[in-house]
């Protein structure tokens, strides 16, 4: 199955990425992607865009040539209290908030500290998706984070790039996460974590993980635009009229 939704992409505003939103729209049309989120790194990353980049995201059209664009961020979990680098002005302009651990902001800690930080980030109610929770550099209590994600209605990501060129060794953890989320009745999100437009929508390896554990298709945010949009509305985000036809 070729999914039509990608929740995790980076533009050249994150200067270790290489494509514009225009590039992503063109690639989306080529691949049949009907909705994607632009989720550049939060400002505490060394080469991330300024907070104004996110505050001004209101200028991004909702629809371009039949492709829907969600305004988002991949925020950084900053400490064990679950604080993220996304202030209220930024949050007010964003449709979707991803958050995860990045070594440049939060150095890897022991399993208990990492787990506490991740759960606290979910508990605060600002984050919709936890990115690459299977990163072996940040060990966590997988069952505890899956239960917390189900409790706080947060999706855990199966990150496709983790199996290709980053976060080596994530496959075993991601399989365990998929099983734990399945058993807890929670949500998963598959993200390409694309840093160049050509990998937009590349979710095949994430899908293979879900297939291996018989993960229920109706608990995958990428299943359709409407599933993702309904999930975001269930988390308090407003209805977006421009997406009514998706």
From Swiss-Prot:
Q: Name one Pfam family in it.
A: PHP
The enzyme class is hydrolase
Q: Write out the residues that bind Zn(2+) 3.
A: 74, 102, 132
- Which SMART domains has this protein been placed in? POLIIIAc
Its GO biological process annotations read: bacterial-type flagellum-dependent swarming motility
Q: Which keywords annotate this record?
A: Hydrolase, Metal-binding, Zinc
Listed binding positions for Zn(2+) 2 are 16, 41, 195
One MF term in the entry's GO annotations: phosphatase activity
One GO cellular component assignment for this chain's record is: cytosol
Q: How is the cofactor bound?
A: Binds 3 Zn(2+) ions per subunit.
> Which SUPFAM superfamilies does the record cross-reference, listed alphabetically?
PHP domain-like
According to the UniProt entry, what is the EC number of this protein?
Answer: 3.1.3.-
Q: Kindly give the Gene3D superfamilies that the UniProt entry links to this protein.
A: Metal-dependent hydrolases
In terms of CDD domains, this protein maps to: PHP_HisPPase_Ycdx_like
Q: Which residues form a coiled coil?
A: none
Question: Which coenzyme or cofactor does it need?
Answer: Zn(2+)
Kindly list the positions annotated as binding Zn(2+) 1: 8, 10, 74, 193
The entry's family comment says: Belongs to the PHP family.
Q: Which HAMAP family match?
A: YcdX_phosphat
What NCBIfam families has UniProt attached to this entry? PRK09248.1 (NF006702)
**Protein name from the UniProt record:** Probable phosphatase Tola_0828
